[in-house]
């Protein structure tokens, strides 16, 4: 140590470096924390966005038939980019039930506005989701998505696939005793079978569909 008690010259750079590094690490920690907080807020906003559009889609779905249907279909078309963002968020975060519910409620919109490839892509994804077991979602959610997927497959000429999807939907709806659901899925099954020219089975399925759904099932066959 020098006679005046000051620190040796060769220790000054090391001490200075230590102080600088400590300050940098502190700044990095603070920045990382701020980013985590920001990301948490962004994720929460994205979740709320997806939840909002799930509610919108599910509340709009029953209005997609009848005299006012075109206005509601156009409303969904205007929000299509937001709906796509909600579907992507559900996919990217593994929110299987939200994604399945969105897709299941959107099939009539996709069908009416000709978004067949997009609709089938999303429905196929959620029904065979690699990020989670869709069987863990409520049974009616899967049954509804299967029925919608059957409709879109039939519209694109995939009649055998449509039949398989509709048959699984019927089985699930039967298991939970959902009569309107059974009527709708049987109608989809009958349509797929009729498109394969199996009119005997088609008539049987249509007849059973009417027995479960009454006038509502008959209306579905005319849409």
Where in this protein do the model-derived segments appear?
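C-terminal boundary/linker of central alpha/beta nucleotide-binding cores
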Residues: 1-38, 43, 47, 92, ...
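Short, well-ordered secondary-structure microsegments
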Residues: 31, 35, 69-134, 141-148
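Short coil/turn connectors between adjacent alpha-helices in alpha-solenoid helical repeat scaffolds
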Residues: 38-41, 63-74, 107-120, 151-164, ...
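Short acidic-capped amphipathic helix/loop micro-motif used as an active-site/signal-coupling element
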Residues: 46-66, 87, 103-106, 126-127
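Residue signature of alpha-solenoid helical repeat architecture, marking inter-repeat boundaries
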Residues: 47, 77, 93, 97, ...
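Amphipathic alpha-helical segments of tetratricopeptide repeats
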Residues: 87-88, 127-132, 167-178, 207-218
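Tandem amphipathic alpha-helical repeat scaffolds
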Residues: 100-113, 141-159, 169-171, 181-198, ...
């Amino acid at each position: 140590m020098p006679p005046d008690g000051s620190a040796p010259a060769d220790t000054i750079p090391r001490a200075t470096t230590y102080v600088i590094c400590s300050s940098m690490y502190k700044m990095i920690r603070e920045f990382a924390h701020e980013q985590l907080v920001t990301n948490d807020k962004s994720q929460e906003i994205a979740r709320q966005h997806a939840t909002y559009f799930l509610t919108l889609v599910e509340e709009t779905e029953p209005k997609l038939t009848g005299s006012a249907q075109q206005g509601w279909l156009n409303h969904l078309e205007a929000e299509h980019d937001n709906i796509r963002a909600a579907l992507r968020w559900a996919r990217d975060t593994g929110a299987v039930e939200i994604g399945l519910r969105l897709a299941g409620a959107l099939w009539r919109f996709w069908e009416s506005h000709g978004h067949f490839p997009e609709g089938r892509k999303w429905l196929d994804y959620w029904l065979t989701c690699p990020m989670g077991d869709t069987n863990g979602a409520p049974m009616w959610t899967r049954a509804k998505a299967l029925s919608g997927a059957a409709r879109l497959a039939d519209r694109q000429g995939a009649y055998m696939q449509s039949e398989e999807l509709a048959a699984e939907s019927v089985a699930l709806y039967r298991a939970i005793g959902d009569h309107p659901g059974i009527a709708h899925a049987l109608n989809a099954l009958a349509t797929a079978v009729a498109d394969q020219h199996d009119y005997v089975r088609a008539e049987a399925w249509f007849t059973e569909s009417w027995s479960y759904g009454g006038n509502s099932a008959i209306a579905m066959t005319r849409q």
